[in-house]
Amino acid sequence: MEECKLDINKGKDAEILYEEYKYHEIKEMSFSSCARTSPELLKKFGCDAHVITSVEGAPKKENKKIWEFFKGSNKIKNLFTMFTCCFANDEEEIWGEETNESVVYKEYTYNSRWKIEIPSYPVREIPYVVADTPYNKLLCPLSSLEWVSKLILMDNANSIGMKNNRYSTNPFIYGMCYIIRNNANRILLESCYCENSTGMSTCPRILEFMPYEPLLKYNSYRLLSTYENSYKELSEMLTNNNAPLEVLIHHVMLYHYYPSFLQSALWTAVSSYLEERCNNGLYSKLLVKAAKQHFGDIRLYFVTPDDIYTFDHCNNWIAIVTRNFMAYIETKRKLEFDSIPFNCPLITQLFPLISSPKEMAWLLLIVCTDSNESWFPVHAYINTKTRILRPRSPKLDFFLKESDLLYFQDKQSISEFDIIRKDLLEDLIQCDSYVNTREQLRRRRETLNRKRITIAKLQNNHSQITFPYKRHNIHKSVDSIQFCKPASNLLTLKDNSYTQIPLEPLLLAEISV
């Protein structure tokens, strides 16, 4: 058999070798250096900075998916099949079979030399601006609104004029409060510490997250090509439901910036997580079905319907509240009877699964908050319930770990991203440990179940056993049977036959198991 060789002079062979060569070249080249010395590479990989700009007369931003830019690259053809980040769009989102989650990117303007100064850190604090907030207002469970109950029955909208069953409460005692407003083309998260439910106790701070899309594409290509095995192993762990909650939350918060194979793995892991907790009533089948359909934003699937509230006489804010956590999300659709788009095929599929007003409240949370939910600090919310996550810096409200911000920073060498690989390996170690622990617990449960079955059989059958000695020689407590000196070692069976068994060791061994 002749050895297969690549013809470097023409066709796909030349393109493959070119991609491999250029990958090693950009491995040690920052985004800004590549834009200065090899702009054709940025253009080839869809990372051309000139595609996105707000300067008049410059090319407008094209609404394409990243996989279209990468389809010529052989190295990541299977790995990077689709990167489903959706681009900022001023038009109202169209609800179809699968919702398009908007990811807002920072639009940088060019200077006179057509250069962009990318900030070294993608998060900055901006001056606080006093704005209308729902502080000092009572909360009511969203599920307690009468029109929410009417939605389940599909009653006419005229019925909402009937007596309202809402009631006021506020479970919040103290802790962090977050506010997510409608901000066109900006990612802002307001936070403060509150000592009680009446308002702010510390000066609020507003952080802005500034992801630059071409830089993200460039870094993603470098990272996914360099650490391909680690990302694939992570995908397998997520798909097989072998990731603990901390690992799952870590990568859920990066969902919008991951390629499609990791996004699909995250949806599978989340749906498995929810399905395991349906039996205890924490979540419902509605959430499991919606997760399998990739409906809405993945962060809100960890919110229990009991924690969803709204405000008295206010239909454009929704709140997620626990004893030590409070988040106000400004809705893009008003909380009204006709908020649910019943013409959406996916919602039509989910509607038969809604059996309570609380489930309807969760569906309203998904539909009405729209893309604002993408920045819900789910790690802070989860930590008030589980306490499994370590305290984080306020600058990490957007993500779980500080190393995650490296995806959005311009670094010269690929070695500067080693901390990302370190975190990936730590997550994989946690997954392995979680698998071993869960297997040990499963075996222990099986052993305990066998013991309980044995005890139950003894309790049900002990009265049918005829002992060849007087009954007063046995204490009546079945749970602690003790034997005096047996008269014989013969055991009378149901068919009146006898078998020679060491009776005392047998029963004591069975009951002590």
UniProtKB/Swiss-Prot annotation:
GO BP terms in the entry: meiotic cell cycle
Parts forming coiled coils: none
Cell compartments where the protein resides: Golgi apparatus; Vacuole membrane
Record key words, sorted: Golgi apparatus, Meiosis, Membrane, Vacuole
Protein name, entry field: Meiotically up-regulated gene 133 protein
Record flagged with keyword Membrane: yes
Role summary: Has a role in meiosis.
Domain of life (superkingdom): Eukaryota
Family: Belongs to the UPF0300 family.
Organism: Schizosaccharomyces pombe (strain 972 / ATCC 24843) (Fission yeast)
GO terms for cellular component: Golgi apparatus; vacuolar membrane
